[in-house]
Every structure is written in C-alpha cells, then in structure tokens.
Regions:
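Extracytoplasmic "Venus flytrap"
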Residues: 31-60, 84-91, 113-114, 180-188, ...
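Periplasmic-binding protein-like
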Residues: 100-113, 132-136, 176-181, 230-240, ...
Length: 397
C-alpha cells in the first residue's frame, strides 16, 4: 500500500513539474519580463532585396524607443525591443516568431514589417500563443474585417489610398483619368478603387486602366500609349523605381499631364532616381513630410541624428517612428503590469492617439485599424512637402 502511495505521489509531482517546465518554456499572454522591463519583438528584412525598406523602418522605430528609454522608459519601465532579420521570407518569419515568443518571452510583436510575412505567423502568435501583433508596417483589409483578437494596425490600406487619389483627381477637375499600374493582382486590386471614388466626387469622370508588366524598365512604349489616350490626369500605382522610370520617360517625351501616386511613389528614392522629372508630382502618404517644420517632425529629425546616425530622416524611417510612438502612447495608459492581455485592453480602449506625425488613431473592440486618413504631399524644389492636413477618403463600396 505504501509503495502504491509513493508511486502515486511521485507521478503527481512529475506531472506538476512538467506543467511548470511547460509554462516556463513558452511565451504567451503572461510573459512580461519583469517590472522594470517591457520586452517586445519584431522582424525586418535587414538583408536581401527589401533591406532598403527594412533597415530604415527599424532605424526609425529604434530611434524612438531609445529616446523614450533615455527619458526613463514607459512609466519607469525600459523598453527591450528585440529585432531579428527575416530576409523578407515568410518561413523564416514563422521560426523567428517562435523564438521571440518561446525563448525571448515577448509580450507583443510591435512595429514589425511585412504583410505576407506577418500573416504567416498569425496561427502561432495570435491564435495559439495569444500574443498581440501591434502597428505592423503593412497589412490587408482581411486583417481587420472583421476585427481579429490581438491584431491592431495604424497604416491606411492601399485601397483607401486609392480612394483618396480618386477623390483628389476629381476635385482637381480631371474628367479623363488614366491609371498606370503594375500587372500583378495586388496592384490591380488597388487600381480598381480609383474609378469608383472619383465618380463619387464627380459622376462625369471617366477612368481607364493601363497595366504594365511588373519591373518594366523601358517606359518608352508606355508613355506613347499614355499620350495616345490624352488623359487630364495620370495616377501611378507602381513601385518607387518604376514610378521614377515613368517620370523620366514622360519628361523625355514632353508629357506634362499632372501625375499622382500612392504612398510607395511618395518616397525619397523616387526623387533620387527621377531627379527633376519628379517636380510637381502629387501623392498621398501615411505620415507628414519629414521636411515639415512642426515640433513633432523636428523631434523626429533630432532623434534620428542622435540615435541612428547614417540613416536618413525620410518617409520610411518616419513610418517606423510613428509605429513605435503610437505603441508607447497606448502602453503608458496601462496601470499595472504590461502583459499581452493588458496591451490588448489598452488598444481596445485607445481613443484619439496623436503621434504628431501620423493621423490621429482611434480603436475599439470592433475597430482594430486605427485610421483611414492620408496626407497629401507634392514635390516642390526637389523634395516632398505636405499640403494641408490629414484627410479621410470617401468610403469604399
């Protein structure tokens, strides 16, 4: 009898030990570091073809987190932001997510990069581990319609950027609009939103699309087709390098039709590659111009110079800065431990979060995308300048 009792006790202790080891070995909602540190994580393409985005985005967010830590952190807690290189690969990103959650025990994924890459982690991070993913630099409408537990974003969707452009060209008086877009489905999906938005503003506007093979470098035949259409305005749904190729060829062929673009067009790389051909181009952006003279932008430029020397204070670094600042503004409202659960509650209760550099954000239990607003920018004297304030595009059908 004593032996059976002893064996039963040993088995019970072993089971308890297994539970303890299991709990210690995973991240999950209760992972919170200690009361002096807030441990969060992210992945970026720091190598490979997309490193030109990943490196500056990381630098912008890191500059803000460093500046907050220099001022004492979030309510006395230091931010420990763990960043790993995913080379823009979804499979690598899943493995990175497991390390961040299980080994580093982060309480959230914050200001990370990539739509497909982040989405690949959702089954493990959001659904299994219950770790929130906050302020991703990327996103898709399906992420937020309906709202998903633990997933909150702050970047206006490409489709809403297109709606803003349709409204803008119509208000500028264009009656015949040509949308030049790369041929993959992702670009077409955005281009298709311009016509309906333009016609909501002015039913007489006619919109036609001109697809271009992705990564085309010779835009001479494209410009010839544009000239033949004789549009009042051209909207570019192209990557920055291709937009620059379009602009240079348009200038070479004497095409002076007003040109508009979505946020990927409004990049420093477009100006660098296109030179004088970019003068006068209009676009929408997710943040204010980094050349603006208001205090929040000045703070950004000063912090970049102090903490991330060698990295430009441009739109891409400002995206990262805005994502980091929004997180801090919301996290500092938490009274008590900063955990996955408390962060999720804080986001659901966050209203009128103003970073000073991006649209004011508001969330709720049913609204996990904080804004639809964009900023108009125009190239003047070789640099992007803000025009007016952030505005909300027409509601899409």
């Amino acid at each position: 009898m004593r032996r059976r009792t002893t064996r039963a006790l040993i088995a019970a202790l072993a089971a308890m030990l297994a539970l303890v080891v299991s709990a210690c070995g995973s991240g999950g909602p209760s992972a919170a570091g200690d009361d002096r540190t807030i441990r969060i994580g992210a992945w970026y393409p720091l190598t490979g073809a997309l490193a030109s985005f990943g490196i500056p985005e990381r630098a912008g967010a890191d500059a803000y987190f460093k500046s907050v830590n220099a001022r004492g952190g979030i309510n006395g807690r230091t931010i420990d932001w763990i960043v790993k290189d995913n080379a823009y690969d979804p499979q690598q990103t899943v493995q990175i997510a497991r390390r961040l959650v299980d080994q580093d025990r982060v309480v959230a994924i914050v200001a990370t990069n990539g739509t497909a890459q982040s989405q690949a982690t959702f089954p493990f991070v959001l659904e299994q581990s219950k770790v929130p993913v906050l302020n991703t630099l990327g996103g898709d409408a399906s992420w937020y319609q309906p709202a998903r537990d633990g997933l909150f974003g702050l970047q206006t969707l490409y489709e809403d950027q297109a709606a803003a452009l349709g409204d803008w060209v119509a208000r500028d008086g264009a009656k015949k609009v040509l949308v030049v877009h790369s041929d993959p489905a992702a670009f077409l999906k955005v281009a298709e939103e311009i016509g309906p938005a333009a016609r909501k503003t002015d039913p007489s506007v006619r919109v036609k699309r001109l697809p271009v093979k992705f990564q085309t470098t010779d835009y001479s035949p494209v410009i010839s087709k544009v000239k033949a259409e004789k549009p009042d305005a051209v909207v570019l749904i192209l990557a920055s390098a291709e937009a620059a190729s379009y602009l240079k060829e348009a200038r070479l062929q004497g095409l002076s039709t007003p040109m508009y673009g979505y946020a990927p067009v409004a990049a420093q790389s477009t100006l660098t590659l296109a030179g004088k051909a970019a003068e006068g181009v209009r676009a929408v952006q997710l943040v204010k111009s980094p050349h603006d003279d208001d205090p929040a932008i000045k703070e950004f430029r000063a912090a970049m110079a102090k903490y991330e020397r060698g990295q430009p204070a441009d739109f891409i670094t400002l995206w990262g800065w805005a994502a980091a600042k929004a997180f801090v503004e919301i996290a500092k409202t938490i009274d008590g431990p900063v955990t996955a659960e408390s962060l999720t509650r804080a986001y659901e209760n966050a209203r009128h979060v103003d970073t000073g550099v991006a649209p004011v954000l508001s969330f709720s239990a049913g609204r996990h995308l904080g804004t639809r607003d964009v900023q108009k920018v125009v190239v003047r004297n070789g640099r992007w300048e803000s025009r007016g304030d952030f505005f909300t595009p027409p509601v899409r059908d």
